[in-house]
């Protein structure tokens, strides 16, 4: 039997996430709560761990305390077996400076690669919502002989201009790479679809080391994986695409096969939550064969009293809904909603309190927000714009710990 390749996972988790403000005012983007019981980073870590890639370094930088704590408390593996998920803050090994880009983050962390000496390196982002079996991508990478493999998701050409786009030939070899093009290239088998980069890469170790070193010496580089490293390897004929549509995740439904969402804006973050709440959700959190991990808490079950109800909603542990109505919403843990309150089409994060007779519609309430009795959020957008953040799509976002 062929010995399994030695794979090191590196997760790029230093994103500031300015477009998600106020949710990122006090935390890194990958630490933002999602789905009633998780954080964004839990999706990539679950994919890697479910695929049995159990040596993972998480590179952090921006306001990383809550992210570091979450990983340390909820992602403990067996150190005796050489398994680990470890947060690695910017080490400043090359002087008193932070990472200047994702490729520079790898360059400043090269000691991790040298210490582990892997055959292949999986480099994934930390702020997307999806399920994927990365082992299948690794196998294609090995069989293709490419130096780098980029995960691509098929999107309509009319929507592809927001992404880094991949022009591949029939064999999957990447012959062109364009950031946010006005005229995106079609896929080899469908001219109306485009391969958009998912920000997930697999490298043969020597190829990555050589490319990162060369990039570090280039004063004109922005030191970005997608903007500099991949185009360099494409120019050298060393990069191929992995079609995400071919990834088969155990337990996936027909509706959520191939699901992937970039939640980099408030509207996208909100919409991804609404994908969770229907009877047959677009993204199914309840796939026991490929579970999303990292969200366990020692809390009592949710409770509904005095006729409180929740319809087409996700309700986190420890929450109490008393004589209140919740519809089409995602509630995290330890949420309390008092008599007569109405919550519709909203994302409610841990520890939120919604008072008697209050109304919350089309809103995102960050941790520990308190909505007083009779107060309204998402009902009068002109009033909300004076005190909160309102997205282009009309989603009202209230920052952590605000009292209304």
From Swiss-Prot:
GO MF term set: ATP binding; glucose-1-phosphate adenylyltransferase activity
Record: residues binding alpha-D-glucose 1-phosphate: 99, 164, 179-180, 197
GO biological process: glycogen biosynthetic process
Coiled coil: none
EC number, as in UniProt: 2.7.7.27
Pfam families assigned: Hexapep_GlmU, NTP_transferase
Function: Involved in the biosynthesis of ADP-glucose, a building block, required in the biosynthesis of maltose-1-phosphate (M1P) and in the elongation reactions to produce linear alpha-1,4-glucans. Catalyzes the reaction between ATP and alpha-D-glucose 1-phosphate (G1P) to produce pyrophosphate and ADP-Glc.
Protein name: Glucose-1-phosphate adenylyltransferase
Gene that this polypeptide is encoded by: glgC
């Amino acid at each position: 039997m062929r010995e399994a390749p030695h794979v090191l996972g590196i997760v790029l988790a230093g994103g500031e996430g300015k477009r998600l403000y106020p949710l990122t005012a006090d935390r890194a983007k990958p630490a933002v709560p999602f789905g009633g019981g998780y954080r964004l980073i839990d999706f990539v870590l679950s994919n890697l761990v479910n695929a049995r890639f159990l040596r993972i370094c998480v590179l952090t930088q921006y306001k990383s305390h809550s992210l570091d704590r979450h990983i340390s408390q909820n992602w403990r593996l067996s150190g005796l077996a050489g398994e680990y998920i470890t947060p690695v803050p910017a080490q400043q090994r090359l002087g008193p400076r932070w990472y200047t880009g994702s490729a520079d983050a790898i360059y400043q962390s090269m000691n991790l690669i040298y210490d582990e000496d892997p055959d292949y390196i999986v480099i994934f982002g930390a702020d997307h919502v999806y399920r994927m079996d990365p082992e299948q991508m690794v196998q294609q990478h090995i069989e293709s002989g490419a130096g780098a493999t980029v995960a691509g998701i098929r999107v309509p050409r009319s929507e592809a201009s927001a992404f880094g786009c991949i022009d591949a030939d029939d064999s999957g070899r990447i012959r062109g790479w364009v950031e946010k093009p006005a005229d995106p290239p079609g896929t080899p088998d469908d001219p109306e679809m485009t391969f958009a980069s998912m920000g997930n890469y697999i490298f043969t170790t020597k190829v990555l080391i050589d490319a990162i070193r060369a990039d570090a010496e280039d004063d004109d580089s922005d030191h970005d994986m997608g903007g500099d490293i991949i185009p360099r390897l494409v120019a050298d004929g060393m990069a191929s695409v992995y079609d995400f549509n071919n990834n088969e995740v155990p337990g996936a439904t027909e509706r959520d096969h191939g699901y992937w969402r970039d939640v980099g804006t408030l509207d996208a973050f909100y919409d991804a939550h609404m994908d969770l709440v229907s009877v047959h959700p677009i993204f199914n959190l309840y796939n026991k064969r490929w579970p999303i991990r990292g969200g366990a808490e020692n809390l009592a079950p949710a409770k509904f009293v005095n006729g409180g109800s929740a319809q087409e909603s996700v309700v986190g542990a420890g929450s109490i809904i008393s004589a209140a109505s919740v519809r089409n919403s995602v509630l995290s843990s330890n949420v309390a909603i008092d008599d007569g309150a109405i919550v519709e089409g909203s994302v409610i994060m841990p520890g939120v309190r919604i008072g008697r007779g209050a109304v919350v519609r089309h809103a995102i309430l960050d941790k520990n927000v308190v909505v007083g009795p009779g107060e309204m959020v998402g009902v009068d957008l002109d009033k909300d714009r004076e005190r909160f953040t309102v997205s282009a799509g009309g989603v009202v976002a209230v920052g952590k710990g605000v009292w209304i």
